[in-house]
């Protein structure tokens, strides 16, 4: 046993060339190199517990971690794990135990894909959200924003604050007392591909156009107006959907009952009436038709019964009038 230990250490120790590319405390070990484990193309991650006070090194350059099953590359190991979960879900029919939101490392079931993505960072110990004012790093954006708020209320920090006057000059409308928070949030969001921060709530975005659309929620600006009724909207896509109320255009058609809709939201809600369970058209039964659609009674779509059809049209008109 003692003779095998140096071999295991040499196998798991990164080479000098790879040490500069891999983050600290993360060891990538191919399954086929570990005795007693089933063959697999997926990598195994050594789990390391990292506390909030640990100084975490800078994240690796984009594309450092490559998927063994496809050409995809990722900046963080947790993103690679979430990507490989998709391969497992497709090969095993919905992930471990048939649950697409179940972690394939520990079997923990998460409420949804977003929670599952955040859960994988617990296995890797990565903290991509980094404070621009101190060496602290966090696993999620919410605790980082709470931490950064303390820099503005607690005196005696050893870190030099950012040039808030320059931020206010670049972003008109940013109050001087908010400029530090906005700049820190933008720096933290840049580490995860969201370098644009809202000047009102510091929410990060991937594109500046998305940030401007979001800021209209705070300012109340509605630059897109309907040419028929004059109603204003924050986004051009919402205006396009509103215009269908006036034109009568209904581009979304159900393939099961031929009902049409003027927006995708009502169309997806209608599709769920044909299937068991939640989801946009597919439920827990794997796409089995519900009793109303399978028996052809038309109770889910107002087909077959004149009274039901009339009630369906009344409800449809009411939905359109509310828009």
Swiss-Prot record:
Residues 9-18 have a biased composition (Polar residues). There is a cross-link at residue 318 (Glycyl lysine isopeptide (Lys-Gly) (interchain with G-Cter in SUMO2)). The keyword Lyase does not apply. Gene3D superfamilies: Classic Zinc Finger. The keyword ATP-binding does not apply. Keywords: DNA-binding, Isopeptide bond, Metal-binding, Nucleus, Phosphoprotein, Repeat, Transcription, Transcription regulation, Ubl conjugation, Zinc, Zinc-finger. It is found in: Nucleus. InterPro entries: Znf_C2H2_sf (IPR036236), Znf_C2H2_type (IPR013087). Residues 1-26, 269-323 are annotated as: Disordered. The modification Phosphoserine is found at residue 13. GO terms for cellular component: nucleus. A zinc finger (C2H2-type) spans 65-87, 101-123, 129-151, 196-218, 224-246, 252-274. It comes from the Eukaryota. Residues 278-289 have a biased composition (Gly residues). One of its GO terms (biological process) is regulation of transcription by RNA polymerase II. One of its GO terms (molecular function) is DNA-binding transcription activator activity, RNA polymerase II-specific. Residues 308-323 have a biased composition (Basic and acidic residues). Its main location: nucleus. May be involved in transcriptional regulation. PANTHER family: KRAB AND ZINC FINGER DOMAIN-CONTAINING, ZFP617 PROTEIN-RELATED. Belongs to the krueppel C2H2-type zinc-finger protein family. This is Zinc finger protein 784. It comes from Homo sapiens.
């Amino acid at each position: 046993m003692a003779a095998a230990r140096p071999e295991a250490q040499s196998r798991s120790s990164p080479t000098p060339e790879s040490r500069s590319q891999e983050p600290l405390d993360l060891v990538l070990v191919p399954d086929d190199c570990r005795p007693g484990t089933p063959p697999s193309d997926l990598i195994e991650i050594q789990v390391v517990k990292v506390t909030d006070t640990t100084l975490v090194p800078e994240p690796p350059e984009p594309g450092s971690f490559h998927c063994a099953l496809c050409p995809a590359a990722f900046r963080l190991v947790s993103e690679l794990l979430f990507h490989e979960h998709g391969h497992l879900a497709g090969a095993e029919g919905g992930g471990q135990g048939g649950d697409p939101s179940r972690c394939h490392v520990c079997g923990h079931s998460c409420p949804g894909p977003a929670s599952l993505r955040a859960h994988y960072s617990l296995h890797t110990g990565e903290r991509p959200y980094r404070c621009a004012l101190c060496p602290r790093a966090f696993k999620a954006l919410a605790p980082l924003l709470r931490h950064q708020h303390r820099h503005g209320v607690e005196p005696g920090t050893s870190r030099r604050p950012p040039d808030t006057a320059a931020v206010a000059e670049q972003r008109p409308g940013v109050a001087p007392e908010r400029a530090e928070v906005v700049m820190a949030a933008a720096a933290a969001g840049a580490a995860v591909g969201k370098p644009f921060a809202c000047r009102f709530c510091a929410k990060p975005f991937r594109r500046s156009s998305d940030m401007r659309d979001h800021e209209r929620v705070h300012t109340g600006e509605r630059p897109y107006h309907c040419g028929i009724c004059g109603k204003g909207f924050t986004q051009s896509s919402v205006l396009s959907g509103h215009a269908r109320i006036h034109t009568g255009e209904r581009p979304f058609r159900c393939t099961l009952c031929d009902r049409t809709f003027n927006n995708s939201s009502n169309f997806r809600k209608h599709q769920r009436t044909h299937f068991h369970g939640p989801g946009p058209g597919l439920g827990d039964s794997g796409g089995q038709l519900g009793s109303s659609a399978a028996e052809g009674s038309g109770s889910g779509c107002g087909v077959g019964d004149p009274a039901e059809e009339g009630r369906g049209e009344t409800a449809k008109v009411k939905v359109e009038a509310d828009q």
